[in-house]
């Protein structure tokens, strides 16, 4: 079975003085999280689309989906974790308790604040995961990448052609993630930023899915303005 996991645990502190997490801010008259979940619900390969958010926002999130997603029977809202990968583990526990977990259980994990993910990107993630391949959605780095170990002086300027910017989805077999994550030490878990790094740290091959420059993560106030523009273009297509 294939499950979507929409990660909505962010608090939106970088968005400035807002009264709710950024995933609940609106673009085009609808909350960002609704736009994102709609993209997953449109794909009938998902058994369930699991939305993970802070405990205090669960009821609010359910109300949003009742309002904006009349056919939301495949959407389940549950509590996320303190950090990203703990949130993914919560999704795996939900799957295990309600559907069972085996080596063919696939998860397509995605940021709630990336509402412009395309059908093509989701499909390619699913196809690779069904082949037993771990995958990460990326785009080539277009700016020069500068490394600084102290935040003040350049340590190195690596060759840009070997570097990519990570996006989401990230997709994999849920059982493999659970096993590898449980093997990590506390120190290893502290340096993790996403699911792909769990596999890389354990020596597993992670392949690339070509993302899109417009598959942006809405993080800062400027991103909201850009998202409104992108949404206008999306509606014209």
Where are these regions (language model features)?
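Residue-level signal for inorganic ion chemistry
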Residues: 6, 33, 91, 111, ...
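Hydrophobic helical membrane-anchoring modules
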Residues: 215-237
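Conserved core of the sugar-phosphate nucleotidyltransferase
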Residues: 103, 116-209
């Amino acid at each position: 079975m294939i499950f979507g996991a929409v990660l909505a645990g962010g608090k939106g502190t970088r968005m400035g003085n807002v009264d709710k997490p950024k995933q609940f801010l609106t673009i085009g008259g609808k909350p960002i999280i609704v736009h994102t979940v709609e993209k997953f619900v449109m794909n009938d390969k998902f058994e369930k689309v699991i939305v993970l958010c802070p405990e205090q926002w669960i009821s609010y999130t359910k109300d949003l989906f009742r309002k904006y997603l009349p056919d939301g029977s495949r959407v389940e809202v549950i509590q996320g974790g303190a950090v990203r990968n703990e949130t993914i583990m919560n999704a795996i526990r939900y799957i295990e308790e309600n559907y069972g977990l085996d080596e063919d259980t696939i998860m397509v994990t995605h940021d709630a604040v990336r509402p412009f993910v395309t059908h093509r990107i989701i499909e390619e993630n699913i196809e690779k995961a069904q082949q037993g391949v771990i995958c990460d959605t990326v785009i080539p780095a277009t700016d020069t990448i500068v490394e600084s170990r102290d935040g003040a002086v350049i340590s190195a300027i690596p060759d840009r052609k070997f570097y990519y910017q990570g996006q989401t989805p990230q997709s994999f077999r849920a059982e493999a993630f659970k096993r590898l994550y449980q093997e990590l030490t506390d120190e290893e878990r502290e340096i993790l930023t996403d699911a792909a790094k769990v596999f890389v740290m354990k020596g597993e091959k992670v392949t690339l899915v070509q993302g899109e420059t417009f598959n942006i993560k809405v993080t800062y106030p400027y991103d909201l303005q850009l998202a409104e523009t992108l949404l206008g273009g999306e509606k014209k297509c």
